[in-house]
Curated annotation (Swiss-Prot):
This is Ribosomal protein uS12 methylthiotransferase RimO. GO terms for cellular component: cytosol. GO terms for biological process: tRNA modification. Residues 14-125 form the MTTase N-terminal domain. InterPro entries: Elp3/MiaA/NifB-like_rSAM (IPR006638), Methylthiotransferase (IPR005839), Methylthiotransferase_CS (IPR020612), Methylthiotransferase_N (IPR013848), Methylthiotransferase_N_sf (IPR038135), NA-bd_OB-fold (IPR012340), Ribosomal_uS12_MeSTrfase_RimO (IPR005840), rSAM (IPR007197). GO terms for molecular function: 4 iron, 4 sulfur cluster binding; aspartic acid methylthiotransferase activity; metal ion binding; protein methylthiotransferase activity. Catalyzes the methylthiolation of an aspartic acid residue of ribosomal protein uS12. Binds 2 [4Fe-4S] clusters. One cluster is coordinated with 3 cysteines and an exchangeable S-adenosyl-L-methionine.
Length: 454
């Protein structure tokens, strides 16, 4: 199925498809590359089988992501496609990739995706292209073409790129470069454009969203940005990647005072124990974890809390892990993502002693999941019998409507599965907000019946 064309130039011969691996920041890069190629006259197709060129936008955050990226690269080169590798693996292994997989036609770094059309032009002329800047410095603004799928009602809005922190386990600063924020005016302009396209929810993303603006305004400016975005006619605005140090009184007040900023706090805390956090090069966090969580719950009783955790970090002892379990039991997060430590070459954690065995790390991960499932189920049960506002997004194979309430972020949290009594076409609900009565809950999802379209 062909994507909607933005094209203003003469069509070119190549038909290009994209294969995406990794996070939503990578997805935004993909959408910009799609828009740029379409503008330059290339036919951008969502069906890889019909394309002769495939751009694989890769992830290199952890080993499993690299393995998936390599599988896709080899799959398409084996099919005889001309493959261009973009994203974090291109940035990470710009010399090794073409040497190890000579079938690759081009590389595009994380700070070079704006050059994708020129790269493809050169590839079509038979050149092997390595377009990877040593230090990524580019960030797209609202003027850069971007493909936004009209069949989706959620869009990610990048407010900054890169990171100035140096967490011991994280390779991202080396792959994405230093922090560079967009101006408030640029972000608001893009939000207004997305609203005109029918987007019902925008999700603000960067490596550290609460550190937004530090580089261009001299201080973190998320609160000011939220106050301006609250004036845009987008029903839901969600923030991902908020760090405790940046959740100031002003930021929390912006959440409270804005009707369309949903009270959903995504806090990648990684751990609870001071010793582990110190080893992670996050010593500032231990004293803040407890107080900031208590403050959020006190100021915004309806707040939904999500966190991500790492188990099996070098030096994590049994008592450290028990501290983490007690932390989870005490604060009862709505959603938790848990990952086993992945040693990444180029990070300080790669060389740390006292490795935790994979067997122990996997057992700890399973333990966290088990504890959190019980907490999540209890949390979800509290919604049974209540009425909730739901964004309906799709129809399931079982002919049920699938949507989300504000307490579920797309892709990473649960969904709300809805039945309909009215004998009308289910497609009429897609992309709309409805009021629903919640009738059942499990540890992941809610179930309910639609009352009316809002």
């Amino acid at each position: 199925m062909k994507q909607n064309s933005l094209n203003v130039k003469e069509k070119k011969l190549s038909k290009v498809a994209f294969s995406h691996v990794g996070c939503e920041k990578n997805l935004v890069d993909t959408e910009h590359m799609q828009g740029l190629l379409d503008k330059e006259g290339y036919e951008v197709d969502s069906n890889i089988n019909d394309a002769n060129v495939v751009v694989v936008n890769t992830c290199s955050f952890i080993e499993t992501a690299r393995e998936e990226s390599i599988r896709k690269i080899l799959e398409y080169t084996n099919q005889g496609k001309e493959v261009i590798v973009a994203g974090c693996m291109a940035q990470h292994f710009k010399d090794e990739l073409i040497r190890e997989i000579p079938e690759i036609k081009g590389l595009v770094g994380t700070g070079d995706y704006q050059k994708i059309a020129k790269v493809l032009d050169r590839v079509e002329q038979g050149e092997i292209v390595n377009e990877v800047s040593k230090i990524p410095e580019f960030i797209a603004d609202e003027e850069m073409p971007r493909f936004v799928d009209k069949n989706k009602f959620v869009a990610y809005l990048r407010i900054a790129e890169g990171c100035n922190y140096n967490c011991a386990f994280c390779i991202i600063p080396k792959l994405r470069g230093p922090q560079r924020s967009r101006t408030i005016e640029s972000i608001v302009s893009e939000a207004k454009s997305l609203a005109k396209k029918g987007i019902q929810e925008i999700i603000l993303i960067s490596q550290i969203t609460t550190n937004y603006g530090q580089d261009i305004y001299g201080k973190p400016s998320l609160a000011k940005l939220l106050n301006e975005l609250s004036k845009v006619s987008i029903p839901w605005i969600r923030i991902h990647y908020a760090y405790p140090t940046g959740l100031t009184d002003e930021v929390i007040r912006a959440f409270k005072d804005s009707k369309n900023i949903v009270p959903y706090f995504d806090l990648p805390l990684q751990h609870s124990h001071p010793d582990v956090l110190k080893s992670m090069n996050r010593p500032w966090q231990a004293s803040l974890n407890e107080s900031i969580l208590e403050k959020i719950r006190e100021e915004i009783p309806s707040a939904v809390l999500r966190t991500s955790l790492i188990v099996g970090f070098p030096g994590e002892k049994k008592e450290h892990f028990e501290h983490l379990l007690q932390f989870l039991d005490r604060h009862k997060f709505d959603h938790v993502g848990v990952f086993i430590f992945s040693p990444e070459e180029g990070t300080t954690a790669f060389h740390l002693p006292n490795k935790v065995s994979l067997e122990v790390a996997e057992a700890r991960k399973d333990n966290v999941i088990s504890v959190q499932q019980n907490i999540s189920k209890d949390k979800n049960q509290t919604y049974v019998g209540s009425k909730m506002k739901i964004l309906v997004e799709k129809i399931s194979d079982n002919n049920e409507l699938i949507g989300r309430s504000y307490n579920f972020a797309p892709e990473i949290d649960g969904t709300v599965i809805l039945s309909v009594k009215d004998k009308i076409d289910l497609k009429n609900y897609i992309g709309k907000f409805v009021e629903a009565n919640i009738t059942f809950a499990d540890e992941y999802d809610l179930y309910g019946e639609i009352i009316k379209i809002l």
